[in-house]
């Protein structure tokens, strides 16, 4: 376990990494899990927060990509920035180098805040680049939201108004959804009607509750064993 990671394995909290690829419906699944009782940490929202005007990540973006990526109110124009970086993998990597350290620190703080309120919480982190960045070991469960690549493209065209070429470029700029399957503990097929996805989430939530209870029981047992060992040493 990497040092400094606020992972559920340290206690009863269950840390779930929710991932997928562009237009797969991670936010929809996150809302369903929130409705069941999960605490949600949205990495896109964290990125927005750390990119607020005059914060270090904001300054790094402006220094690297120029003032043209700013709106009149000095906030980042994410659509314009996205057009720049998704057309050039090196620029995308540079953006990630600027933003990710601040986002990960904000995530750690969020997890610890939840732990302080609900030590037995099920925390779901909506993290698009979880697998690409090799963060699997930060989580107790990896939950992958899946739709076929052609459905990704279709949804991008309908939802975002992209041309077919733009949609294909966005999909190809990321790790293939098919390549992510082997990294997942649980897969949600989100290609069908919403009701089918909800039915899957209902079953998955039962699994997560069971895992959290087992983890809590294991943590309590470990604590008791440690206490006994200490008492023997004192004696």
Swiss-Prot record:
It is an enzyme of class 2 (transferase). It catalyses: 3'-dephospho-CoA + ATP = ADP + CoA + H(+). InterPro entries: Depp_CoAkinase, P-loop_NTPase. It is found in: Cytoplasm. GO terms for biological process: coenzyme A biosynthetic process. Pathway: Cofactor biosynthesis; coenzyme A biosynthesis; CoA from (R)-pantothenate: step 5/5. GO terms for cellular component: cytoplasm. Its EC number is 2.7.1.24. ATP binds at residues 23-28. Keywords: ATP-binding, Coenzyme A biosynthesis, Cytoplasm, Kinase, Nucleotide-binding, Transferase. CDD domains: DPCK. It comes from the Bacteria. Residues 15-219 form the DPCK domain. Pfam families: CoaE. The keyword Nucleotide-binding applies. One of its GO terms (molecular function) is ATP binding. Catalyzes the phosphorylation of the 3'-hydroxyl group of dephosphocoenzyme A to form coenzyme A. Belongs to the CoaE family. PANTHER family: BIFUNCTIONAL COENZYME A SYNTHASE-RELATED, DEPHOSPHO-COA KINASE-RELATED. This is Dephospho-CoA kinase. It comes from Syntrophus aciditrophicus (strain SB).
């Amino acid at each position: 376990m990497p040092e400094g990671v606020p992972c559920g394995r340290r206690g009863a909290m269950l840390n779930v990494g929710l991932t997928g690829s562009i237009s797969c419906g991670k936010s929809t699944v996150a809302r369903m899990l929130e409705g069941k009782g999960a605490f949600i940490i949205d990495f896109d929202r964290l990125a927005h927060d750390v990119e607020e005007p005059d914060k270090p990540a904001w300054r790094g973006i402006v220094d690297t990509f120029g003032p043209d990526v700013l709106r009149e109110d000095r906030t980042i124009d994410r659509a314009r920035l996205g057009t720049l970086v998704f057309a050039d993998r090196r620029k995308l990597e540079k953006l990630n180098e600027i933003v990710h350290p601040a986002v990960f620190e904000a995530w750690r703080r969020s997890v610890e805040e939840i732990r302080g309120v609900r030590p037995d919480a099920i925390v779901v982190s909506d993290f698009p680049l979880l697998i690409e960045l090799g963060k699997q070991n930060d989580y107790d469960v990896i939950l992958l939201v899946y739709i076929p690549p052609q459905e990704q493209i279709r949804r991008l065209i309908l939802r975002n108004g992209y041309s077919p070429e733009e949609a294909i470029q966005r999909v190809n700029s990321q790790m293939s959804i098919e390549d992510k399957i082997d990294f997942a503990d649980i897969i949600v097929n989100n290609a069908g009607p919403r009701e089918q996805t909800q039915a899957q989430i209902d079953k998955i939530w039962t699994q997560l509750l069971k895992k959290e209870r087992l983890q809590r029981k294991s943590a309590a047992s470990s604590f008791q064993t440690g206490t006994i060992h200490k008492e023997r040493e004192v004696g």
